[in-house]
Each structure stands twice: as structure tokens, then as C-alpha cells.
């Protein structure tokens, strides 16, 4: 008996069409010392399990650390003016990084959430959008000191109807990618040959 075909995901049309040029890559974002400090902090104990990017009941779950900002949909009773302060209390090395980014690459952006995801071997995400608001952005940082192509774990971006790939971004160490939250994207599975947790650090922002 043949398995039922998978349904192609369809997403609401955004306010503007997107292309690969909307996904901006910044390499060598931090000094080696600051990169190591961020990675060591993220790789320390304190992970919780159960995060997911696809709301389906059988969606893959993975590890996460929430540092500051909104946890769900932005309607929580949290003082947005305190996000950067809260980040400094919860994750000093990450707050130091945010201070650098907010005065350079992300000048004019306001922090709405900061968290980290951890994917072990065999784990993967689900195709999703972070927001449908044009002024909302997602920034993904890859903090590892090294990564091998055989480890996989690329971040893949799709067209709005999910029918084709816009871009596939390699998790190159010390790389930051910035993109509109409305672009559908997914963290691809981690190879069984990967001996470490694939860690990504996210800054959600608005302009």
C-alpha cells in the first residue's frame, strides 16, 4: 500500500513578494573571543525540551533556551522597554552581542525576543513563518567554532507557496543572517555523523 502524498504547505501571501536578496548574510560578526564566549554560554546546561516550529501534533521537538522578550504572540503583558535589560540579566554574553549588533548591523531595530535552539543528531524543524508583519525581522546566528558540510543542518528558505527554494544557508561558524519574518523557512535535519548539538541564537526584532 502506498503512503498518502504529503500536502504542500501554503502560507498567506505577504505584503510584498520575497527573493533571495531579502536574506542578508553577515560573516565574521564577532571577534574570536566574543564568539567563543557566546558559544560557551549557550552550550552550558540549562536547556529545556519541547520547542517546535510546526504546530502539527506530531511535529519534531527540540531543545531551547528563552532569554528575553515575548514567548508567544507579542500580546503578553511584558514591558518591551525592559527586554534589553532582561537579556543582560539572563544572558550577559548574548546581551553584549546584542549591544554590538544594535549599534551596527541592526541599527534601528528593537528587540522583541531572544532565544536559542538546540538540535541533536537526527532532529529537524518544520516549515514556518515567524511573523506576517512587514516590519518584523528574524536574525539567526551560528555560534559554533567549526562545522562540517557532512553535519547538514542548513537553514532553508522557501517561496510563499512552498513550491520552491529561495535559498539554502550553510550554518557557517560566526555567521549571522537577517531576513523578514514572513519568509517561510526551516532548519533541516542534523546528520547522524554530527557529534554535537546544532545551536542557533535568534534575535527577533522590529523596525
Where do the protein language model's features map onto the residues?
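Catalytic core of non-heme Fe(II) oxygenases with the double-stranded beta-helix
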Residues: 95-207
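Non-heme Fe(II)/2-oxoglutarate
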Residues: 2-107
